[in-house]
Amino acid sequence: MMRTLITTHPLLLLLLLQQLLQPVQLQEVDTDFDSPDDEMEELEEYLEEFQSTGPTRPPTKENVERRVIIEPGMPLYDRDYCNEEIKRKNVYHKYRCVTEHYFLLMQYDELQKICYNRFVPCKNGVRKCNRSKGLVEGVYCNLTEALEIPGCEYKSFYRTGYVLITCAWQNEIHKLIPHTINDLVEPPKHRSFLNEDGVFVIPP
């Protein structure tokens, strides 16, 4: 019940809880109703992120799995894929819609391994990204309407390509973990991504 309410009416639930919790602190919320601990933890995470005025918290495996990794089910080429999945997975930044997002049909462990691949230019040409060695299926979501939830509307683009990601070091586990999905680059037909030295390059 709690998960259904969170995924279908996130803004309404957050506004209601803000009124109920003032001036009570979040840790003082009465949790004597029937709700699994993990669902309460997820709700608290949403509230903390929405109300925070500081920098965005570093990514975790759980966040990446929840927001990026998808399972076979709804056809990836469905025109409403992004609208449905972004609402279902609560992919927002504070009270605003994200301008773009990627969903990837792969396992988290496979995505994490990309962090140890060689560097390539990101799509903006400024930063360095890590590229997958093989092609990955996914969906690119581009915001077309609204800036604040729940009015986010997206156009969906099915892609099969090389994943470009940035990674961050996590001290707790002493490993690199995926930070952001930078792009899903579709290879041009009959054209190699390797130059004469065997180094991967992004075509202009």
Curated annotation (Swiss-Prot):
GO cellular component terms listed in the entry, alphabetical order: extracellular region
SUPFAM superfamilies: RNase A-like
GO biological process, one term: defense response to Gram-positive bacterium
Signal peptide limits: 1-26
Keyword Phosphoprotein: no
SMART domains, sorted: RNAse_Pc (SM00092)
Any one GO molecular-function label of the UniProt entry: nucleic acid binding
Keywords in alphabetical order: Disulfide bond, Glycoprotein, Secreted, Signal
Disulfide bonds, paired cysteine numbers: 97-152, 115-167, 122-129
Glycan-modified residues: 130, 142
Record localization: Secreted
Family that this chain belongs to: Belongs to the pancreatic ribonuclease family.
Role summary: Does not exhibit any ribonuclease activity.
PANTHER family from the UniProt entry: INACTIVE RIBONUCLEASE-LIKE PROTEIN 9 (PTHR11437:SF14), RIBONUCLEASE (PTHR11437)
Protein name, per record: Inactive ribonuclease-like protein 9
